[in-house]
Amino acid sequence: MKIMFVSLGCDKNLVDTENMLGILRNRGFEFTDDEYEADVIAVNTCCFIHDAKQESIDTILEMAGHKKDGKCKALIVSGCLAHRYHDEIEKEIPEVDALLGTASYDKIAEVVLSVLEGKGYSCIDDADRLVMTKDERIITTGGYYEYLKIAEGCDKHCTYCIIPKVRGNYRSYPMEYLVKQAEQLAEKGVKELILVAQETTVYGVDIYGKKMLAELVKKLAAIKDIAWIRILYCYPEEIDDALIEVIKNEPKVCHYLDMPIQHASDSILKKMGRRTTKQELKDVINKLRENIPDIALRTTLITGFPGETQKDHEEMLDFVDEMEFDRLGVFTYSPEEDTPAAVMPDQIDEEVKEQRRDAVMELQQEVSLDKSEEMVGKVIDCLIEGKIEDDDTYVGRSYKDAPNVDGFVFVKTDANLMSGDIVKVRIDGAMEYDLIGSLCD
């Protein structure tokens, strides 16, 4: 009995997929990457923004075709789209045999067995349920880096975001559970742990009564075979001295912070339900750079939020120009059902949203090139990810680069390197988002 998984959306969703794979492996199921060979196809979906929702729907419909044209006997849909739109999916896509909500993925084995027996099965548990599996997950990232999801849900309730509705309130995983998971990953050869959650910076508040991210990082850093620890999804207003100190002083922690700010206009930040002002954002950025001069800061922005004026947009451009983020991504605003922002007045035309996004990215391209050129002549550590076929060039990442969202370091050498090796590289050339270097002797 062969199962194929399609995992869509964010890295948090990927962790859920890997957990489901681990559960099924321990129940004796086999896996395939070929949808034509699969007896069961499972799609773990996303619906964070319109494009993600559409990708999920298109993928479900594509996989549904294999119930007619392939070996597929059952189609299972899990994740955010299944949780939010389970009634609509059951009505509109009858080929779907089972639905699993975001807090129900640990029941995947029972679901598979049920649908193979010809029984329909939908399990949409309360989004606030915290799933902790005993089964070791299956690594799908290549084996040298992995995501460690330290919490579920979110309590911030930004006006544009549906995450609290589909992922529930903020729930931290117990520290001992996370340390055990990290130890298991290290035993499998993982070198880089990437801490993720809807928000990492308030880890522990709900179960320990105070923020405990810094303490968690210290415990993870004590694991022998973990070489790098990277922290994503930090809310700027929650970055405290304890976190800054552990990033500064713990050698295994990458001098890198992903800190989504979404906008730089005070009026738009307020409409978004964000809890910072432009000046407060400047203050935390300056504080991070004063304490950790070589820190790489990544952020994300949203253009075209309802009511965004040309003046608001220019404030964003000025902020990007002044703050010089090392890494930056931009999304156009996507109105989501059942969110306050979707019914706000002064919705922005798609063309204007895209023009403003392009303007920010054009500016950031210049900033990124300047930042890259500053690296020329420096020697840095790189984690090797692979080799370009028929070329003496390896592909790696520096501490400044998170996988899948940032750039690469192309390393020229005739040495025999392995994926997962961490090597010293001298930077010889720079592009907007990537670096070129040579292996140090």
Describe these PLM feature segments.
Residues 343-441:
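Terminal RNA-binding accessory module
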Residues 1-203, 242, 253, 257, ...:
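Proteins enriched for Cys/Gly/acidic motifs involved in redox and nucleic-acid/cofactor modification
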Residues 187, 214-215, 222-223, 228-229, ...:
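Radical SAM/AdoMet-radical enzyme domain recognition
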Residues 47-52, 190-215, 219, 223, ...:
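Conserved glycine-rich "GG(E/T)P / GGGxP" loop and the immediately following alpha-helix
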Residues 197, 233, 261-263, 299-303, ...:
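Active-site proximal loops enriched in glycine and acidic residues that flank catalytic Cys/His/Asp
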Residues 178, 195, 231, 259, ...:
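Conserved, mostly hydrophobic/aromatic
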Residues 161, 165-168, 228-237, 263-274, ...:
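Conserved strand-turn element in the central/C-terminal portion of the radical SAM core barrel
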Residues 208-221, 241-255, 308-325, 350-355, ...:
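Short, electropositive alpha-helical surface patch
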